[in-house]
Amino acid sequence: MKELSVDHLLGIKYINENDINLIFETADHFKEVINRPIKKVPSLRDITIANIFFENSTRTKLSFELAQKRLSADVISFSAAQSSVKKGETLIDTVNNILSMKVDMVVMRHSNPGAAYFLSKNVKASIVNAGDGAHEHPTQALLDSYSIREKLGDVAGKKVVIVGDILHSRVALSNIYALQMQGAEVKVCGPKTLIPRYIESLGVTVEPNLRKALEWCDVANMLRVQNERMDVNFFPSTREYAQQYGVDKPLLDSLNKEIVIMHPGPINRGVEITSEVADSDHSVILNQVENGVAIRMAVIYLLASKIQ
């Protein structure tokens, strides 16, 4: 059986293209499984997984839990509000207490960049990064690339523009790593205040004009503005942002070409994209959600195989 080159999924920059291909091949199998009348397989009946979320999450947490249960793993979940970390306990002590209950794998979301990496060096369990601050969100990038592959046949050679709040987005960074690793060309588009200064050092081109970016691309991945990570105003108003960087149907129609619209969610309808665009044939947003379960099943299964 083929194996991943890593014992943890901490970020896209820690894996290679062979790992991505193996995850996609495994996800192809699980995509077929989750579309059967009986959507469960007994693959991980002897594995216990803890989902530890120190930041709020709806889609990602539900997707991980469903993926784990589809694999027949035992699952425990808790949020920071219920955690002893609130009482002063360290992250390592919290996780080691959980591991002492014979937990095999930890899926963690944390506000601090590098938290998952830090944990992997200090505890004896397989760690999956479900998002660490504005650093990485590897399973989101994997499901995004998988969705492009599903829609367009391949990721290699495709032109992808990531639009919006690049500065505060863990999705953007993981996507850049994953897309480039698979041979795609990447540009970013957004207000200058929301583009990191280092971005061009990653081999990414900045295109400040949305129309030009859309005329160039095959795929547009629309990111929301992450107001919860901002302590100052990065643009004059939401209305002005939507006028400059929002995608609506008249804009898409005027391009005279087919492009794929993606969004990691949650969508701010009328800001990044209008409802007409979100619900159109251009959009693969709900496909991304479905593919997220298959991708997370694949990641968990492959990492658990190394434990066993």
UniProtKB/Swiss-Prot annotation:
Pathway: Pyrimidine metabolism; UMP biosynthesis via de novo pathway; (S)-dihydroorotate from bicarbonate: step 2/3. It catalyses: carbamoyl phosphate + L-aspartate = N-carbamoyl-L-aspartate + phosphate + H(+). Carbamoyl phosphate binds at R59, T60, R109, H137, Q140, G265, P266. L-aspartate binds at K87, R170, R224. SUPFAM superfamilies: Aspartate/ornithine carbamoyltransferase (SSF53671). InterPro entries: Asp/Orn_carbamoyltranf_P-bd (IPR006132), Asp/Orn_carbamoylTrfase (IPR006130), Asp/Orn_carbamoylTrfase_sf (IPR036901), Asp_carbamoyltransf (IPR002082), Asp_carbamoyltransf_Asp/Orn-bd (IPR006131). Disulfide bonds: none annotated. It is an enzyme of class 2 (transferase). GO terms for biological process: 'de novo' pyrimidine nucleobase biosynthetic process; 'de novo' UMP biosynthetic process; amino acid metabolic process. Its EC number is 2.1.3.2. Heterododecamer (2C3:3R2) of six catalytic PyrB chains organized as two trimers (C3), and six regulatory PyrI chains organized as three dimers (R2). Belongs to the aspartate/ornithine carbamoyltransferase superfamily. ATCase family. This is Aspartate carbamoyltransferase catalytic subunit. It comes from Flavobacterium johnsoniae (strain ATCC 17061 / DSM 2064 / JCM 8514 / BCRC 14874 / CCUG 350202 / NBRC 14942 / NCIMB 11054 / UW101). The gene is pyrB.
